């Protein structure tokens, strides 16, 4: 039986927006310090979204490891989206552009997971794995292990990147949520380089592996 009144909008077609900075932090060891950012934002519906992702490191007055991604995503399951678009490596070294294809979502046991493959205009291949997990110690105190791993099919000496497993960035952060949208944190991270990438770093006068203490904030809106 039909009822009177206006037709209600379908909520899964409503347009929303979200911005998250998971890392806004200073990284410190005994010899030098650096500033690291990692954030992403999207606008769209429950099924279709446009994404911007940005990450990089400011060290010694120069930007390193700068990556900007512009993606479209489509929900394919309750927990995962397929993504495709462009990645640009923009920092103090020569710019590189890639086509990007991957998945993002919640893996079993609610691990945040991003797995993305890349193809450059020269036919080079790359892949990135990012994973993290929020362990609630209390309603406000949260421990987050995190890992990022990069792989390249061919070396790029101009960007100090070698073929094979290139680098890892992994850490453990303890944050306190003053409110749901703002949480300062402390932690420790390990930045490691492998193989040719480690050799490039040493020749440039950098370390192939560093343990650093971090202080930062996580925020979203």
Predicted regions and their residues:
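Transmembrane beta-barrel strands of outer-membrane/channel proteins
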Residues: 23-26, 52-56, 84-88, 115-119, ...
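Repeated loop/turn-to-beta-strand initiation elements of outer-membrane beta-barrel proteins
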Residues: 47-52, 78-82, 109-113, 138-143, ...
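Residues that define the transmembrane beta-barrel architecture of outer-membrane proteins
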Residues: 15-17, 33-37, 64-68, 95-99, ...
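Membrane-embedded beta-strands of outer-membrane beta-barrel proteins
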Residues: 39, 70, 101, 129-131, ...
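Detector for outer-membrane/organellar transmembrane beta-barrel domains
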Residues: 95-157
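Outer-membrane beta-barrel initiation region
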Residues: 1-62, 66, 70-74, 213
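Residue-level signature of outer-membrane beta-barrel architecture
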Residues: 43-45, 74, 105, 119, ...
